A protein has these predicted regions:
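Juxtamembrane helix-loop-helix junctions in multi-pass membrane proteins
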Residues: 1, 106-141
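Helix-coil boundary and interhelical linker segments in multi-pass alpha-helical membrane proteins
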Residues: 1-7, 52-64, 120-123, 186-192, ...
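Membrane-interface interhelical linkers
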Residues: 1-13, 23-33, 81-99, 125-126, ...
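Hydrophobic residues within alpha-helical transmembrane segments
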Residues: 9, 13, 17, 44, ...
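Specific alpha-helical transmembrane segments that line the substrate/conduction pathway
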Residues: 16-18, 27-79, 130, 137, ...
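Juxtamembrane helix-loop boundary signature in multi-pass membrane transporters
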Residues: 47-109, 212, 218-240
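A broad helix-preferring feature
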Residues: 103-117, 176-185
Length: 240
């Protein structure tokens, strides 16, 4: 089975919207609202995917999966409920939240757009690896254009002179940008977009765990409770 012109079109548009444009908007919103509120707003991801998958792919969830989705989203909201030290004014906060929702909606649309291509190559690991890499190419065009336009004015390469940021920057780029997207694409190819998106929401819970391991951030009773609720929700989605 080979990629058609329509498949290439879907991959290119998906990369530009979901990686090139959405990531920039999301990172800008993250600078405004902070990680805690961003994690809370991120709960709109699976509802957006479910909505787009219903409209464009005709997907449906079972009642048990809806219950599991509610558990996962509820767990994230529960973990983020007592937010402190909000880093901006109310007006900027609202602006940042709107940007974050827009970015997440674009990510959701982009993955639903490419879902038919992934389903064609279900289980074909080499082909899915190639698709993950190819999708990054158009996704890199937008940041490259922005770099060429604004580098002289803002000296965007100046922070790279600090070699302390090289390891986390390169490591994050490899693990999050390519390997993360690669495994995400494999999962998306093996099940429905709606189910995969719900399970993908557990990333927020993993952030709590890894923040404890690597950043020594406190793991509160609220966080532990949220993790247990999210695990139960993921199990319901899986068996549903």
């Amino acid at each position: 089975m080979v990629l058609t012109n329509e498949d290439f079109f879907r991959l290119i548009v998906s990369g530009i919207i979901g990686i090139g444009i959405a990531d920039i908007i999301f990172l800008h919103s993250l600078n405004i609202i902070g990680a805690g509120i961003s994690a809370l707003v991120d709960t709109v991801y699976s509802p957006f995917v479910i909505f787009f998958a219903y409209i464009f792919l005709g997907e449906h969830l079972s009642p048990l999966q809806f219950l599991g989705a509610g558990c996962i989203i509820g767990a994230i909201i529960f973990a983020s409920l007592k937010l402190q030290n909000i880093p901006t004014t109310r007006k900027r906060l609202e602006y940042g939240i709107i940007l974050c929702i827009l970015a997440i909606a674009m990510m959701a649309f982009s993955i639903v757009l490419v879902k038919p291509v992934l389903s064609k190559f279900q289980g074909d690991i080499p082909k899915l690896m190639w698709i993950a890499g190819f999708r990054l190419v158009p996704g890199s065009i937008v940041p490259l254009i922005i770099f060429l336009l604004f580098n002289k004015k803002q000296n965007l390469l100046k922070p790279l002179k600090d070699r302390k940021i090289w390891f986390p920057l390169i490591g994050g780029s490899v693990f999050a940008t390519y390997l993360g997207i690669f495994f995400w694409i494999i999962g998306m190819s093996l099940t429905t977009a709606s189910t995969a998106s719900i399970l993908n929401q557990t990333a927020t819970i993993f952030i709590l765990i890894f923040a404890r391991i690597f950043l020594k951030e406190p793991l509160t009773k609220r966080s532990v409770g949220a993790i247990l609720i999210a695990v139960a929700g993921a199990y319901l989605v899986f068996i549903g």
